[in-house]
Amino acid sequence: CDRRQRQMCIRDRVKDLCKKYNRDFNKISQWYNGYKLGNVSIYNPKSVVEAVLSGEYGDYWTKTSAIEAVTNYMNYDHGALKGIITKMLSGDKVSVNVSRFSNDLTKVNSADSALTVLIHLGYLAFIKGEELGFGYCYIPNYEIRQEFVNAILELDWKEIYNPISNSKKLYEETLKGNVEFINKTL
């Protein structure tokens, strides 16, 4: 594939794998796509292969850093990042200034620095903004979202985890048609 065709080529290769192994391409994309390099969508190749071969969609993330390191950054400034992470868990992108980070992990002294570290570690994706050094970060896919949920459990952020857990339960009970549970919850 030439440069202009890379995105389509990567997407087509993943589609071919899904077709060959009778897997749902849309689910694979939800779980393992989401990073971008310029205009090229990047899938997590290891996770795609694991999911395609096993037939199970799940967290195959090879941690680039121990969960403790991630939770340390998430707990920056006594949990000031909770609101930012909550926004990202809901699917929003948040603005970040990556130019303030000095690539020194001992000098994480702002929310922007903490988010930039998480971008470097692969836990967040980044979209370049109009101004140099500014952009937006977001949780790229379901697989990484699960890593954040694991970190939230580790940190015991009940005010974030409980609504996520309750929302999941409400969704499951709605699919079952459990009107009594739905009425009680709402």
Where do the model's predicted regions map?
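Single conserved hydrophobic/aromatic residue that forms the stacking wall/gate
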Residues: C1-I10
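Short linear sequence elements within intrinsically disordered, low-complexity coil regions
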Residues: Q5, L37, S65-A66
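Conserved AAA+ ATPase small/helical "lid" subdomain
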Residues: V14-D59
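Extended alpha-helical interface modules used as scaffolds for assembling large macromolecular complexes
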Residues: Y43, V48-L186
